[in-house]
Structure formats: structure tokens, C-alpha cells
From Swiss-Prot:
Pathway the protein acts in: Lipid metabolism; fatty acid beta-oxidation
Listed name of the protein: Enoyl-CoA delta isomerase 2
Family named by the database record: In the C-terminal section; belongs to the enoyl-CoA hydratase/isomerase family.
Role: Able to isomerize both 3-cis and 3-trans double bonds into the 2-trans form in a range of enoyl-CoA species. Has a preference for 3-trans substrates.
Coiled coil: none
GO molecular function, one term: delta(3)-delta(2)-enoyl-CoA isomerase activity
The organism's taxonomic lineage, starting at the top: Eukaryota, Metazoa, Chordata, Craniata, Vertebrata
SUPFAM superfamilies referenced in this protein's UniProt entry, alphabetically: Acyl-CoA binding protein, ClpP/crotonase
Modified residues (Phosphoserine): 99, 117
Gene: Eci2
Residues involved in substrate binding: 196-200
UniProt modified residues of type N6-succinyllysine: 49, 53, 60, 68, 79, 88, 90, 127, 159, 286
């Protein structure tokens, strides 16, 4: 994922897009009866550089728009093309301010920065250190204890959506786990979600545009899924909450899937103009039959944990109140089983399928690359990243 540039206040425009609208009423956060001076405005621009916490793409777009309105007035630039995601988002944000006077835009910019500075300082003091922040920015958390490698999707504020960097980090974590002395490898999620799947802003962050993102995405996805196909040790998913997209389709490559009764399983590929991945076009019909697989992969039916169990996607469902205790007690028992015996048994179970799975993965990635460049997919992604936030 491309990093956001923080070195200059006027560059508060996202390389990643999520929500592009912020009600103007929320901008009058400070001194409504006062007029910000030019010096106040310049001080605010300098203050932006010192923010310790990323305020999110929604706010960064608003800062960009207010800066442009305060310095140049209403937007008169031609509207960028539909495929120019970043510049179109910037244009939309600026144009949405209409005829807002320069003085008002300047005041709103100063007030918004002041509010962000206060929030950032309070957040830093509340956390009492940088450890939590470092874990949050890492994307995944990998721990090894008692014979278990635990890989946690660790972006709870983003519902554990998976970035390009997280794909690479998971590949590395699995390669390390395949050769270390742990016995089983477990995936779970931090917070309320297991994972909301692929971070769609992966497609809007590539500097070379959609084609570069599609090419990179196909390569990374192919290696990512192959790593799961080839993983030699028992692989267990502890699905603590809603799972979406690739976090669901991957489950067909796991050896056991334990779910909380509050978990749901959703593969909205058609809604996004995309197609199945992670070998689900093969594993899902094999597990649940063609009709039930089509309900999920074609029509985007969301399954409850009980429904997923009935269709063979989930091994066992546990009550939310006892989920963590029951599952981890069981996993600690599994980790004491003879490791070589489990490796050999898994190889016997999976070996006849490996060649087929690699072929399916190759075909799915090739198809997905084409879908990502299709008008249907691009329109769906644009609709997603420009949607209004839920109140």
C-alpha cells in the first residue's frame, strides 16, 4: 500500500480512498465568531506535519479541499477521468465546497486542524506508549507459544481489511512457520471482525493506476494462495466475527475452521464486479455442492455460522460466551500431538489435490486480473470508495 505523504500540509490528499464526503456542518469546530488570520492559516499548515495519528482519508480529503478553497477559491479545474481515482477524489472534495468564501474555508481549515491536534494528543496520552500503535500499523501480529504460531489480522479499526503489505507479511509468516518448531498455525482476527477481506483501496493506491494495481494484485494473490496450498502443517481458522471475501474463500484450504456463533461468511464478488479467488471456484462446490456454492459465489448470500457449518465450510460452532476458552483449550491439546505424524497425515490427505489447486489458483488470478480492469469492477469500486458513511 502506498504511504501517504505528510511532509507538506498542502499534500493532505489520500493515496488510499475510502469515504469521500464529510458534512460541512462538522467543520465548524472552533471559533465561529472569529476570522482566522493568514498567520493562523500558516500555523495550521505547519501543525498538520506534527500530527501523530493518521486522521483517515475522509479528513485528509477535506483538508486538501479547504486548503485549495482558501488559497485559490472555488474549483475551476476540469474534472479528471473516471479511472484517475486519486485526482478525481480530490476534485470531488474541492468542487463540493462550491462558492464557500476563501475566508470561511481558511477558518474551517484552522478549526479542523486544531480539533485534530487536540484529538491526537489525547489519544497519545490515553494509550500510554507507542507499543499499541506499532502493532496497529503492522497489519498482522505473529506470536509463537506452546507449539502454536498465531497470526492475527490486526487492523480492528478497518475491520481487519487486508492490504498489499499484509499479503506479503502473511506469506513471510507462513514460510517461517512452515520450518520452525511450532506444531500448528492458527489465524484469527483482532476486535469484532475476523476480516472484512481485501482492502479495496489497494486498487486506488498504486501510482501507476488501475492497470498497475491489477498486475501487482494478480502476482501477489497467486503467491499468497499458493503459500496456503503448500503449507505443510495443520492450519486452523478461529473465526471470531464476520468474515468477508478472501478471508472466507481461503477457508477451503484450512484443515479446521472453528467459528463463534456471531460469525458470518460473505463473498460479495458479483456485487463488486469480481470473481472467486483462493481456489473457492473448486473447493466450495466440492464441499457444499454446486447449488449452495453458487448461492455464495454468484449471488453473494451471507451465511450464519450455523449455515456455514451445515454446508461443510465450518468444522464446529461455539457460543460467543465460551468461544475463546473452548477453542484455545482444544488447540493447546492439538499442539501436543506428534508433529511429524500430523505433517505426514496432512500430506496424504492433500497431495492428490495440490496440482489441481495450483492450476485453479492460476486460472482464478488470470480471470481476476481481467475483472479488475473491467468497467463493472471499476464502477463498483468507485461506488464503494465514494459511498456516504453510515450514521
Amino acid at each position: 500500500m502506498a504511504a501517504v505523504t505528510w511532509s507538506r500540509a498542502r499534500c493532505w490528499c489520500p493515496s488510499l480512498l475510502q469515504v469521500l464526503r464529510l458534512p460541512v456542518t462538522k467543520l465548524h469546530l472552533g471559533r465561529p465568531a472569529m476570522r482566522a488570520t493568514q498567520q493562523d492559516f500558516e500555523n495550521a499548515m505547519n501543525q498538520v506535519k506534527l500530527l501523530k495519528k493518521d486522521p483517515g482519508n475522509e479528513v485528509k480529503l477535506r483538508l486538501y479541499a479547504l486548503y485549495k478553497q482558501a488559497t485559490e477559491g472555488p474549483c475551476t479545474m476540469p474534472k479528471p477521468g473516471v479511472f484517475d481515482f486519486v485526482n478525481k477524489a480530490k476534485w470531488d472534495a474541492w468542487n463540493a465546497l462550491g462558492s464557500l468564501p476563501k475566508e470561511t474555508a481558511r477558518q474551517n481549515y484552522v478549526d479542523l486542524v486544531s480539533s485534530l491536534s487536540s484529538s491526537s494528543e489525547a489519544s497519545s496520552q490515553g494509550k500510554g506508549g507507542a507499543d499499541g500503535k506499532a502493532q496497529e500499523s503492522k497489519g498482522i501480529l505473529v506470536t509463537s507459544e506452546g507449539g502454536i504460531t498465531k497470526i492475527t489480522f490486526n487492523r480492528p479499526s478497518k475491520k481487519n481489511a487486508i492490504t498489499f503489505q499484509m499479503y506479503q507479511d502473511i506469506i513471510l509468516a507462513l514460510k517461517n512457520a512452515s520450518t520452525d518448531d511450532t506444531v500448528i498455525t492458527v489465524f484469527t482476527g483482532a476486535g469484532d471482525y475476523y476480516s472484512s477481506g481485501n482492502d479495496l483501496t489497494n486498487f486506488t493506491s498504486a501510482s501507476g493506476g488501475m492497470e498497475e494495481a491489477a498486475n501487482k494484485g494478480a502476482i501477489v494473490l497467486r503467491e499468497f494462495v499458493n503459500t496456503f496450498i503448500d503449507f505443510p502443517k495443520p492450519l486452523v481458522a478461529v473465526v471470531n466475527g464476520p468474515a468477508v471475501g478472501i478471508s472466507v474463500t481461503l477457508l477451503g484450504l484450512f484443515d479446521a475452521v472453528y467459528a463463534s456463533d456471531r460469525a458470518t461468511f460473505h463473498t460479495p464478488f458479483s456485487h463488486l464486479g469480481q470473481s472467486p479467488e483462493a481456489c473457492s471456484s473448486y473447493t466450495f462446490p466440492k464441499m457444499m455442492g454446486s447449488a449452495k456454492a453458487a448461492e455464495m459465489l454468484l449471488f453473494g448470500k451471507k451465511l450464519t455460522a450455523r449455515e456455514a457449518w451445515a454446508q461443510g465450510l465450518v468444522t464446529e460452532v461455539f457460543p460467543e460466551s465460551t468461544f475463546e476458552t473452548e477453542v484455545w483449550t482444544r488447540l493447546k491439546t492439538y499442539a501436543k500431538l506428534p508433529p511429524n505424524s500430523m505433517r505426514i497425515s496432512k500430506e496424504l490427505i492433500r497431495k492428490n489435490e495440490k496440482e489441481k489447486l495450483h492450476a485453479v489458483n492460476e486460472e482464478e488470478c488470470t480471470t481476476l486480473r481481467a475483472r479488475w480492469l473491467s468497467e463493472e469492477c471499476i464502477n463498483a469500486i468507485m461506488s464503494f470508495v465514494t459511498r456516504k458513511p453510515k450514521l
